[in-house]
């Protein structure tokens, strides 16, 4: 196959992965606002950063990248701390997801160029164009967190409700008929 066709195929894959990442972010926003209160939403996305980061350990195991375990494990630990702190501090979630997008970019750079950005064999292999999908999700969801930061701060104030948005979602109590 000619290099131009290969490059064109890669561009199509990249565009599709970015679109899927954007749709995933939109779906995450829609569902979290539908079913979760502001406080629950912040907790969910804080905890969700942990398995998102953990994907790279799964990739290291799958691709047999034994040399990548120390760096990937350290990255998972850092993202886990950011996620746990983000349960109460919105800025930590914004930074955590944005940094995870950068982490995705580093892996994608290594995958596409064959050259190590951080040193030989220190990062794990990833599926083709996975970094584009994940980085688009991370950046868009971090932007959403920025718009929700004031609501999340307010949700932790004394007397704040923990139930999902009134009239929507699971677990909404029905008003008594009088």
Regions found by a protein language model. Name each.
Residues 92-96:
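Active-site alpha-helix of zinc metalloproteases
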Residues 2-20, 33, 40-50, 74-91, ...:
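Functional transmembrane or membrane-interface alpha-helices that line membrane-embedded catalytic
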Residues 24, 30, 170-174:
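Polar low-complexity intrinsically disordered regions enriched in Ser/Thr and small residues
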Residues 152-178:
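Short, highly charged, low-complexity non-transmembrane loops/tails of multi-pass membrane proteins
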Residues 67, 99, 133, 168-175:
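A subset of signal/propeptide-processing and intrinsically disordered low-complexity segments
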Residues 25, 29-66, 161:
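Aromatic-rich, lipid-facing transmembrane alpha helices and their immediate juxtamembrane interface loops
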Residues 55-86:
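Helix-adjacent hinge/juxtasegments
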Residues 97, 101, 105:
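Catalytic glutamate of the conserved HExxH
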């Amino acid at each position: 196959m000619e290099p131009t066709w290969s490059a064109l195929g890669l561009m199509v894959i990249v565009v599709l992965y970015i679109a899927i990442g954007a749709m995933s972010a939109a779906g995450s926003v829609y569902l979290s606002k539908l079913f979760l209160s502001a406080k629950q939403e912040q907790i969910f996305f804080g905890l969700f950063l942990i398995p998102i980061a953990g994907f790279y350990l799964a990739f290291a195991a799958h691709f047999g990248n034994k040399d990548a375990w120390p760096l990937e494990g350290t990255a998972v630990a850092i993202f886990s701390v950011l996620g746990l702190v983000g349960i109460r501090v919105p800025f930590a979630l914004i930074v955590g997801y944005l940094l995870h997008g950068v982490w995705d970019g580093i892996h994608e750079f290594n995958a596409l160029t064959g050259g190590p950005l951080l040193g030989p064999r220190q990062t794990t292999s990833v599926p083709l164009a996975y970094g584009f999908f994940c980085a688009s999700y991370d950046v868009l969801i971090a932007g959403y967190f920025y718009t929700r930061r004031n609501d999340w701060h307010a949700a932790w104030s004394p007397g704040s409700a923990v139930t999902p948005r009134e009239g929507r979602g699971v677990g909404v109590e029905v008003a008594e008929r009088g």
